[in-house]
């Protein structure tokens, strides 16, 4: 399974946030899908988007929920230096 999150260039994040988001999202997805050797990438693009390749519709929905939970809890796991 391959997961790609794009964040609109018009809403820049603090330094280090892209890498931190990718790491936290990978950790949470690995916890929810322990048999998955999936790759998670987070990058800037023209618009916000979530792309999940090689997953069932139900898995895509769960990954979308995990992304939402991760984003909403950023104050708990992101430390800006």
UniProtKB/Swiss-Prot annotation:
Keyword Signal annotated: no
UniProt GO BP: DNA repair; SOS response
Tree of life domain: Bacteria
Cited Gene3D superfamilies: DinI-like
UniProt cross-references to InterPro entries, sorted A to Z: DinI-like_sf (IPR036687), DNA_damage-inducible_DinI-like (IPR010391)
GO function terms (MF aspect): enzyme binding
Record's keyword terms, sorted: DNA damage, DNA repair, SOS response
KW DNA damage (keyword) present: yes
Family: Belongs to the DinI family.
Function description: Involved in SOS regulation. Inhibits RecA by preventing RecA to bind ssDNA. Can displace ssDNA from RecA.
Protein name as it appears in the record: DNA damage-inducible protein I
Source organism (scientific name): Escherichia coli (strain K12)
Classification of source organism: Bacteria, Pseudomonadati, Pseudomonadota, Gammaproteobacteria, Enterobacterales
């Amino acid at each position: 399974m391959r997961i790609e999150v794009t964040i609109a260039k018009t809403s820049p994040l603090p330094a280090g946030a892209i890498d931190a988001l990718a790491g936290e999202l990978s950790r949470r997805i690995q916890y929810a899908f322990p048999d998955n050797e999936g790759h998670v990438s987070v990058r800037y693009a023209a618009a916000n988007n979530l792309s999940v390749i090689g997953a069932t519709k139900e898995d895509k929905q769960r990954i979308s929920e995990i992304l939402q939970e991760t984003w909403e809890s950023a104050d708990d796991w992101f430390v800006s230096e």
